[in-house]
Amino acid sequence: KVKVFKTQIILKELEKKMIGKICGTGSYLPDYIIDNFKLAESVDTSDEWIQERTGIRQRHIAKKETTSYMASMAALKALENAGTEPEEIDMILVATSSSETVYPCTACEVQKMTGAANAVGYDVNAACSGFVIAFHTAQAYIHSGICRTVLVIGAERMSRMVDWSDRGTCILFGDGAAATLIKKSQKLFFSYLDSDGNEEVLFSKRNDYLKMKGQDVFKFAIKAIPL
């Protein structure tokens, strides 16, 4: 009941102010591909097993591309798709968990590579939900009037973080980037975010590679968001 009431208040407030709409999109995928049959040569799995559980047939792998390069290529395509010049961008938000450096952030690299001289940029690190949270953040900046045009990018180079002998993770992840250009609009937009840091599924021992409790995550997800 509290969440419903909170939602009603937010909707009423949104009706009074500007909000953002997607005006352009772009993406980038590396050329090198590893399909399920190739994976089955090194781990105990099969194309049928992977597709049945994930729907994934293949994943793109960055051999030379960096996270910032893939993000920039996707961003330039989004700008072209929207018919917008880089100088018009007020903010760049990059959702990533696999940046090459801690500092500078990937968003600053994208600013340089795209020529978005007037934009401020920073990264959002929220794993699988990163792009959604970055998109929601962009809406907040537009809603407040601080920004008029925001570039939101999701970019990952997960292949360098995955243990390719771990069937629980190597079948799921690949590399690539996607970008959306968001501009102010009077159309209504609403989203709701929630976090739960109490679940045991969130915790694992520190490791050199990405680790994930897939079954536990799945069970938590369908409990939190009923199908």
Residue ranges and their predicted role:
Residues 74-90, 227:
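Phosphate/pyrophosphate-binding loops at sites that engage ATP/ADP/AMP, CoA/4′-phosphopantetheine
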Residues 19, 91, 148-152:
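Short glycine-aspartate micro-motif
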Residues 13-64, 166-223:
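Condensing-enzyme catalytic core mediating Claisen C-C bond formation in acyl metabolism
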Residues 51-53, 57-69, 97-150:
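Conserved catalytic cysteine-centered active-site region
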Residues 2-17:
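Short, Lys/Arg-enriched N-terminal segments with co-localized hydrophobic residues
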Residues 141-174:
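Flexible, glycine-rich active-site loops centered on histidine and acidic residues
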Residues 91-97:
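Short glycine-rich or small-residue beta-strand-to-loop segments that form or flank ligand, phosphate
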